[in-house]
Amino acid sequence: MTHITGTLYIISAPSGAGKTSLVKALMDAQQEPQHGAQAKIRVSVSHTTRAMRPGEVDGVNYNFVDRATFLSMIEHGDFLEQAEVFGNLYGTSQSHLQQTLDEGHDLILEIDWQGARQVRAQMPQARSIFILPPTQQALRQRLTNRGQDSDEIIEARMREAVSEMSHYSEYEYVVVNDDFAGALEDLKAIFRANRLTQQHQQEQYSELFQELLA
């Protein structure tokens, strides 16, 4: 039996661009009947020292750990990448990532540009996607509508967003989230197209290709 290895997808975006909502919608869409056995996307669950927000679940949204535990994991080489954002540490488990890919699942990493650079340096075959808002004004409005942060925090997030967006050119694909449904279709198209590359088709249909050319 042919062993099919999953593909790693790096998805980055400034806070408020809709990355989390788009990834959730992508995951929901693959549960639809017409996807059947093709449904094999997983989302990596990062470790973080950030405080848990209302509605979040440990082990589902993030693996929440204290700073001492996180630093110990760095010392033991447990992370493929790690970064500090707004004073909070985030990292991706190396062993979990490799196990998921070896099982044939595509894996989504939702990380910032710093983490993306670290991952691409070690796994250049990873696909990378950057999600942009239609305008800065729209981004600011989305952050304000969340109702989670003070004006001071929102200003800090906007400065961080501009810095994050300046790295969009380092990514293979760019999705502008102006219309959510359209952006979701663009995201789906990237995954569909990647599964049709010669390399992926060779893995899936190697016996067929041999038979056709016999």
Curated annotation (Swiss-Prot):
ATP-binding found in the keyword field: yes
EC number annotated for this UniProt entry: 2.7.4.8
Enzyme class: transferase
Residues the entry annotates as binding ATP: 13-20
Annotated keywords: ATP-binding, Cytoplasm, Kinase, Nucleotide-binding, Transferase
Listed GO CC annotations: cytosol
Keyword field contains Transmembrane helix: no
Swiss-Prot/TrEMBL catalytic activity: GMP + ATP = GDP + ADP
A Pfam match: Guanylate_kin
One MF annotation (Gene Ontology) recorded for this entry: ATP binding
Guanylate kinase-like domain sequence ranges: 6-192
PROSITE patterns: GUANYLATE_KINASE_1, GUANYLATE_KINASE_2
Localisation: Cytoplasm
SUPFAM superfamilies: P-loop containing nucleoside triphosphate hydrolases (SSF52540)
HAMAP family per the UniProt record, alphabetical: Guanylate_kinase
Family per record: Belongs to the guanylate kinase family.
Function: Essential for recycling GMP and indirectly, cGMP.
Protein name: Guanylate kinase
Organism lineage string: Bacteria, Pseudomonadati, Pseudomonadota, Gammaproteobacteria, Pseudomonadales
Gene name tied to this protein: gmk
